[in-house]
Amino acid sequence: MNRREMIKMTGTAAVGATVLGIPVASSAQENGNNNASGKRRLKVLAIGAHPDDPETCCGGTMCLLADAGHDVVCVYLTRGEAGIPGKSHSEAAAIRVVESENACKVTGARHIFMSQVDGNTEVNLARYKEMRELIDRENPDIVMTHWPLDGHRDHACCGILVMDAWRRLDRRFKLFYFEAMSGTQSQMFHPTHWVNIESVLERKHEACNCHVSQHMEDVYLWHATMEHFRGLECRCQAAEAFAQHSDALPTLP
């Protein structure tokens, strides 16, 4: 649902039709290169800085797209090496990789881990190349990633790397940014699209709770507040919001 559709809407937002412009159906099953509705099976990348970022920020959308028969890939920039107090980087990474694998089983996504280090992410020529080559190899139709204006440096680095890849790959995929703890981490986030996640909310929570080391019972309160607020914006109980990156100049209706 985009901003214009939201403004025109007179009833409760319904799951179905499209998600970020992609056809979805609640009972779709994979069928070769097509989904159950007969539409072309698309590839969607959700690129997060840490294990748990894609799940908390766009986990509901991933579930909806995977259920519709689309190829959903969870890409983690780091292995969350600095994310467990008292554990070494290697110990924490081993734990968080398993948690991420379990979460992907819930959302229906496959996973890819990149080579950056939690808390020490970089934006340089080598890292630009690494991200660009991964996205080029996967050849997605849509990429979802962090809003680059973020108080968490790892989030900001991730968004910047993906944005650069989008430009250098001739904008051949649609790029959507998601929010993370808006106001605390994501700053000045201005959504263009909303996704009603009521039907998969419990499953999103299950995926997030796979990240046991992150104490989701406390952390998720921020995300639950965002889900509720974005739901109020589009007249449903829970939603995820996205900002589409487009170089097109705005035009009158």
Where are these regions (language model features)?
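Metal-dependent de-N-acetylase/amidase catalytic core
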Residues: 3-16, 21-47, 110, 122-253
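ATP-dependent adenylation/pyrophosphate-handling site
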Residues: 44-51, 55-89
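Glycine-/small-residue-rich active-site loops that bind phosphorylated ligands and cofactors
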Residues: 53-54, 119, 150
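Glycine-rich, phosphate-binding/catalytic loops in enzymes
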Residues: 61-67, 91, 160-163, 194
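A conserved beta-strand->alpha-helix junction
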Residues: 77, 104-117
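A short acidic, helix-capping loop that chelates divalent metal ions and anchors anionic groups
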Residues: 80-87, 120, 184-188
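Short glycine-enriched, charge-decorated loop/helix-capping segments at active-site entrances
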Residues: 87-91, 117, 191-194
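Glycine-rich phosphate-binding loop and adjoining beta1-alpha1-beta2 segment
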Residues: 87-107
